[in-house]
Amino acid sequence: MAGAGKTTVGNSLAKLLNYDFIDGDIKIEEKINQTIQNYLDQYGRKAFTKIEEEVLLSVNFNQTILATGGSAVLSDTAMNFLRENSEVIYLEVSYETISERIFNLSERGVVRGPGQSLLETYNERLELYKRYADHVVKNNGT
């Protein structure tokens, strides 16, 4: 979920382990040559999740930490690939903390259904995050 701390925690862990770090959102933006939010505005959720899946399926996990986008969990194909090739860690963060961390939802690139609120998006993904996780780490700190 956006605002969970995936990039911050992933980057810190990669430095600690002397691994490479990949920010999935940055890889996606490099592929589409625009911001995620612009792409979502132009092409919508379905087109974006297809691109996201392609990017995730191309990752080589040899001594690499990957911070996926929060919507990666919407693709069974991508998540099964991640579980087969890596350890999946779910950063568990309360909705209250997420909503405090995300200031401008309309510019953040959060993949949502039409008219879907942040809370509805959070609730839609919560069980999926738990289902695919090999490990759960609470991350409600600042």
Task: Tell where the protein language model's regions lie, with residue ranges.
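A glycine- and Lys/Arg-enriched "phosphate-lid" helix/loop adjacent to the NTP-binding pocket
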Residues: 84-127
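Short glycine-rich anion-binding loops that position phosphate/pyrophosphate groups of nucleotides
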Residues: 69-73, 94-96, 142
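NTP-dependent small-molecule kinase module
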Residues: 8, 12, 16, 87, ...
